[in-house]
Structure formats: C-alpha cells, structure tokens
Amino acid sequence: MHAAVTDRLALEAAIRRGLERDEFRVVYQPIVALERGVLLGVEALVRWEHPTRGAVTPAAFVPVAEEAGLIQPLGRWVLEQACRQGAAWAAAARAAGELPFSVTVNVSARQIEDAGFVDEVRDILERSGFPADHLVLELTESTVMRHPELARQRLAALKALGLRLALDDFGTGYSALSHLRRFPIDVLKIDKSFVDDVAAGGEPAALVE
C-alpha cells in the first residue's frame, strides 16, 4: 500500500515537471472514410516521453492527472496545440483550394465542470485563428452523466461557439439512452459492446426499439 502511494505521488510530481519542461507532445490520428478513402479529420492524442521512465502510456498518467487536478492544464495545453496546428492546416488547405478537415480533441469531466472552460475554449480559438466549425470536442457518456444538468448547460454554451460535439463510448451506460436528446451532440460513437448486445437481442435491443 505504501509503495503504491509513493509511486502515485512520484508520478504526480513527474507530471507537474513534465508540463513545466514540455515533455508532452500531441500526435494526430487520421479519421478516414474507408469506403471513399477520404480524410475527414484527425484526432489529437497526448503522448508523454519521460526523460528516465521513457514512454508513459496515457492509461498510466491520465487518471493520475485527473485525480491531482492536473488534467485542466494538460487539457488546455493539448487544445492550444491542436488549434494552432489546425489553423496551419486550414490555411494550407485554403491556399491549395481544398476544404479544411476537422480536428478532434478529447475533454475530461473536470474540464467540462470547470466554470471557466467555455471562455478558455473561446479564447484559444480566437488566439489560434482556427475556425470553430472545424473543432470537435469529444467526451464520454460517463462524463456527461456525472452531472447531467451541468453538462447540458456547458455543452450548449460550447455549441454556441460554433464547434461540434462528439460522444464516445455510448452504450456503456444504457440508462443514459433516453437522456441523449437532452444533449446537443453532433457525433455519436457507439461502443462495440452495445452493438453486440443489440445484435444478440439483449436489453439494449429493447431500448433501441
């Protein structure tokens, strides 16, 4: 128990130093329409190359950042990087006579619940020059259902900025299905377990009907 606590505190301190020393980076995963082979957009993913630990997986550091209250500065940094890069890509696309593609950025429950998050997003969009309608903020079903009414208000305010909203892992909490229409979601990513259960005629199939 003591060793686990010590390791967690050490990782938390390392995350703080990593933010100060620019050890994090953003990589972009293509989102492609397979039937047409067309690039629809990219998803911004955070990576951490620690000077002594080496590559630290998001599964290892993101939960610690969440618990330590570090996900807000980390998430802000990722959003800033993604919007700056997105603005550069959009300018290049326009110069080539092509349509800009979207950039998707994941946001956490703590970011959504932060009273200053909407203003933060607005400020980043304005400073970066990235068109709001090409930004997609992605959150999970569990994030919106943690505090549904607060999430609904925050998402409505974010939508008013002109960006799009995506819901990931939908179907992991079936009770939320009837509440989906309350949220201004543009893109729905359905969890594979939900699809499998629908095909098998389980409880989700009845909910879909």
Model-derived features: where do they sit?
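Helix C-cap/alpha-to-beta connector motif
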Residues: 73, 77-107, 123-134, 161
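The catalytic core of metal-dependent phosphodiesterases that act on cyclic dinucleotides
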Residues: 41, 122-198, 202
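Conserved long alpha-helical elements within nucleotide-processing catalytic cores of c-di-GMP signaling
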Residues: 59-63, 72, 156, 178, ...
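Structural preference for long, well-ordered alpha-helical segments in enzyme cores
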Residues: 11-14, 18, 44-45, 64-65, ...
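Residues at alpha-helix caps and immediate loop-helix transition turns in enzyme cores, especially N-
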Residues: 7, 57, 116-118, 150-151, ...
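Active-site core of bacterial EAL-family cyclic-dinucleotide phosphodiesterase domains
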Residues: 2-64, 92-93, 101-109, 138, ...
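Signal-transducing alpha-helical linker
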Residues: 3-10, 14, 20, 66, ...
